[in-house]
Amino acid sequence: MENNTEVSEFILLGLTNAPELQVPLFIMFTLIYLITLTGNLGMIILILLDSHLHTPMYFFLSNLSLAGIGYSSAVTPKVLTGLLIEDKAISYSACAAQMFFCAVFATVENYLLSSMAYDRYAAVCNPLHYTTTMTTRVCACLAIGCYVIGFLNASIQIGDTFRLSFCMSNVIHHFFCDKPAVITLTCSEKHISELILVLISSFNVFFALLVTLISYLFILITILKRHTGKGYQKPLSTCGSHLIAIFLFYITVIIMYIRPSSSHSMDTDKIASVFYTMIIPMLSPIVYTLRNKDVKNAFMKVVEKAKYSLDSVF
């Protein structure tokens, strides 16, 4: 499809224009990004190294960590560059690439969360058939499906956005190339693009959320039938971390994308975007390890092995 754009680059306004906030924000977001990389890479490595964590739940969790690294890395380095040297320009192709990878990994996380909900349903509601239900092939198909849908969704969104002509302002009132902020700059008819954004985002979010809610409804029914008092707290606690992650992710995504353009506020969008592109990827490994004895035990084993290796060297 022909692209009639006359814009070769965009200008990202960033989070703030106040000079006194540039350095504090740079330090804060650098720490957040380092914690995100360390936590998520650590989670992936831990799952790979410990055979006790080679289960469907941790397989999906490792992919969730990968998705968190993906969309955090698509956004944060450019934000840090803008804060440090005030380089707010982003090329046309870099803007498209940033939007593409954000859409890919956000969609992947969306469907991974529903896959994890189905996994918890199989573990709690059909424990005797769990190993035959969540086979390696099933897990691989679910994970591959998440990535395929992610790339398909991103391709549609990018193709729809960058077919438009940008012949007016090139100043994006955001800190990254997010579709709602970019399409406001077009001099083409944008109602179709806005409709595509809302419809596809709504389908992705609510379909995955429906699978998640149905899974947890059956989990709740099963727990209430089989356990009373303290008995049902243990199986329910295995789902607690997942429910927290679901709540944090979907609240911000719904605020960002499943609203008509007339109700968008750039300041609200920036706050929500900081939360889901930087804060949630940082919190994810913390949320999943706080009450998880398996991960804690695996971590202690790695620490003990590292200490033993150091002692043997010195």
From Swiss-Prot:
Record's keyword annotation contains rRNA-binding: no
Coiled coil: none
Disulfide linkage: 95-187
Stretches in topological domain Extracellular: 1-23, 74-97, 159-194, 257-269
Entry's transmembrane regions: 24-44, 53-73, 98-118, 138-158, 195-215, 236-256, 270-290
Major place of residence: membrane
Entry-listed glycosylation sites: 3
One MF term in the entry's GO annotations: odorant binding
Protein's cellular compartments: Cell membrane
InterPro entries: GPCR_Rhodpsn, GPCR_Rhodpsn_7TM, Olfact_rcpt
Assigned keywords, A-Z: Cell membrane, Disulfide bond, G-protein coupled receptor, Glycoprotein, Membrane, Olfaction, Receptor, Sensory transduction, Transducer, Transmembrane, Transmembrane helix
Membrane topology term: Multi-pass membrane protein
GO cellular component: a single term: plasma membrane
Cytoplasmic face residues: 45-52, 119-137, 216-235, 291-314
GO biological process: G protein-coupled receptor signaling pathway; sensory perception of smell
Highest taxon of source: Eukaryota
Role: Odorant receptor.
Family: Belongs to the G-protein coupled receptor 1 family.
PANTHER family given in the database record: OLFACTORY RECEPTOR
UniProt-recorded name of the protein: Olfactory receptor 5B17
Upper classification of the organism: Eukaryota, Metazoa, Chordata, Craniata, Vertebrata
